[in-house]
Amino acid sequence: MPSLRTRREEAEMELSAPGPSPWTPAAQAHVSDAPAVTHPGSAACGTPCCSDTELEAICPHYQQPDCDTRTEDKEFLHKEDIHEDLESQAEISENYAGDVLQVPELGDLCDDVSERDWGVPEGRRLPQSLSQEGDFTPAAMGLLRGPLGEKDLDCNGFDSRFSLSPNLMACQEIPTEERPHPYDMGGQSFQHSVDLTGHEGVPTAESPLICNECGKTFQGNPDLIQCQIVHTGEASFMCDDCGKTFSQNSVLKNHHRSHMSEKAYQCSECGKAFRGHSDFSRHQSHHSSERPYMCNECGKAFSQNSSLKKHQKSHMSEKPYECNECGKAFRRSSNLIQHQRIHSGEKPYVCSECGKAFRRSSNLIKHHRTHTGEKPFECGECGKAFSQSAHLRKHQRVHTGEKPYECNDCGKPFSRVSNLIKHHRVHTGEKPYKCSDCGKAFSQSSSLIQHRRIHTGEKPHVCNICGKAFSYSSVLRKHQIIHTGEKPYRCSVCGKAFSHSSALIQHQGVHTGDKPYACHECGKTFGRSSNLILHQRVHTGEKPYECTECGKTFSQSSTLIQHQRIHNGLKPHECNQCGKAFNRSSNLIHHQKVHTGEKPYTCVECGKGFSQSSHLIQHQIIHTGERPYKCSECGKAFSQRSVLIQHQRIHTGVKPYDCAACGKAFSQRSKLIKHQLIHTRE
């Protein structure tokens, strides 16, 4: 069975084909013999009724010179033209029997063929004249033809032409006496100004089509009309589900997907599903490393052009969207909407697992991964997976060494902006996080959380080797190295090995002499920030750590721990040479130098060596004459803090050293030792 061909192809074949015309006398005789039932009131031209007449009977009707249905600018020279005009969008097969074309009865076409088969868009209905037996005019056929691309549609009994079927429908539904008078445009009339504009704007090479509302130019008449529909508010395509109207059929089809629960497009990377293919394609670009769209201002690259356009607004000073509550302005309306939820407290996105609510849907999606354990973002270098793409990007800087965030004060670079913000507080001295129990302030929230464990006594981190518990995970990790004996960090200058990188960094300051942390009170410098913090308590007198046994307070937690061993008698650090035990690891280290004879600390003034750095520091005061420790009672100054403490007992009368033999008390331990000799001689 031959397929339907376009009008141009048929015409070219007829003009070029040799032999007699297919419009033969036999065909004309057959047409003239066909029964012709006329429309009521149309006896003058004998318009045949579509329900009782085959196509051949309409051929002479189309060629009546005075027929109302014959348009001024459309003539049908061949029966193929009539056939195509009537059925251009219907899938109807043609059977050639000699020179006569057989088609289904047109009444069947009127009544039985579905609106969708005729190309009528979803949400529109055929006019009354097409849904029952009645006028099946060329104009009605134009209505069926229009939505699928034909350019010119004719209105029955009204010499007008339209480019969109909705405008033709509107024309047909107006009574003849109410139709407007023809504009002076060759006798053609239009119901809407947009139709007149569409009629006037036949494009030529010299004059493109211009929209009178916005000045936009078009090369095609349908594009101009679609633009003008936006301005006039005319919406021709209606959704059957919600009644919403649209100016374009393609937009209606996209809208229909919002009523569908099924999401047909699923991402193979992360499993997220989408209703529309365009949304699915945009999402997939997030997984791709390709970022072809680059900002000319800052060089930042994006996977989507829309993301680039949004980013470029960040370089613009204009922020047209302002919050009515606080006056903060935003470049995007979506950002303003999200911001306003801070004031309203609205959190519309609720987790179905735990009930936690979020202001943004993106935060809910990220949170869901804590329940599912999903980590869709994997590092190509080491294979480590992350639940968020932002975490992956931060991690990748470990491999690249990139540190894009630089401190304006000292020039120190950082891989994360959060680390830069924390570092800035070193320069500003800002400590925004305050303990509600003791009032102590911290520069980082994590430091406050760790500090609060002093008050609560919480030690959530337990060593699985010895069962010892710690308040901080970092301290547990350091402790576990005691069991392994591992010291992977070695000094390149002296070869000394350390179990922690921080200890190595601090040690290297011995060789470089670098002491970047200075005390604002006395100017003393330190190689470690922690030592500076401890030193500053000398000036403030702060002693936040209190012994629960005797009430004694200490400036350092480590000193408190060491002190508590006096009460419990615990001496966990034992010398493997002589078996002597100590309550402090530092005392054991100092003691072991007795066996080795090691004195690594040498005075640069006199060359004297010492086994402990503290002894060297105390010795150097002899050369400098410095006496930094002053008694608050009498003003007397001392070179050593321990001597000051002993001196203060003169004023307080404290005698902490008791003789076990006679009970006599002494203010100094050395005096107790001398006294005990009296009993041993006896």
UniProtKB/Swiss-Prot annotation:
Bias kind Basic and acidic residues: ranges: 1-10, 113-125
Coiled coil: none
Localization of this protein: Nucleus
Major subcellular site: nucleus
Region (Necessary for transcription activation): 62-210
Residues covered by region (Disordered): 1-33, 112-134
GO MF terms, alphabetically ordered: DNA-binding transcription activator activity, RNA polymerase II-specific; RNA polymerase II cis-regulatory region sequence-specific DNA binding; zinc ion binding
GO terms (BP aspect): cell division; cellular response to sodium dodecyl sulfate; negative regulation of apoptotic process; positive regulation of cell cycle phase transition; positive regulation of cell division; positive regulation of cell population proliferation; positive regulation of erythrocyte differentiation; positive regulation of kinase activity
Keyword check for ATP-binding: no
PROSITE patterns, alphabetized: ZINC_FINGER_C2H2_1, ZINC_FINGER_C2H2_2
N6-acetyllysine found at: K487
Zinc finger regions, C2H2-type: 209-231, 237-259, 265-287, 293-315, 321-343, 349-371, 377-399, 405-427, 433-455, 461-483, 489-511, 517-539, 545-567, 573-595, 601-623, 629-651, 657-679
InterPro entries cross-referenced by the UniProt entry: Zinc_finger (IPR050331), Znf_C2H2_sf (IPR036236), Znf_C2H2_type (IPR013087)
Region (Required for nuclear localization): 268-393, 341-373, 473-503
Span of the signal peptide: none
Residues joined by cross-link Glycyl lysine isopeptide (Lys-Gly) (interchain with G-Cter in SUMO2): K253
A UniProt-annotated Pfam family: zf-C2H2
Gene Ontology CC terms: nucleolus; nucleoplasm; nucleus
Annotated keywords: Acetylation, Activator, Cell cycle, Cell division, DNA-binding, Isopeptide bond, Metal-binding, Mitogen, Nucleus, Repeat, Transcription, Transcription regulation, Ubl conjugation, Zinc, Zinc-finger
Purpose of the protein: Acts as a transcriptional activator. Promotes cell proliferation by facilitating the cell cycle phase transition from the S to G2/M phase. Involved in both the hemin- and phorbol myristate acetate (PMA)-induced erythroid and megakaryocytic differentiation, respectively. Also plays a role as an inhibitor of cell apoptosis.
Subunit composition and interactions: Interacts with INCA1; the interaction inhibits INCA1 activity and induces the cell cycle process.
Annotated family: Belongs to the krueppel C2H2-type zinc-finger protein family.
Name by which UniProt lists this protein: Zinc finger protein 16
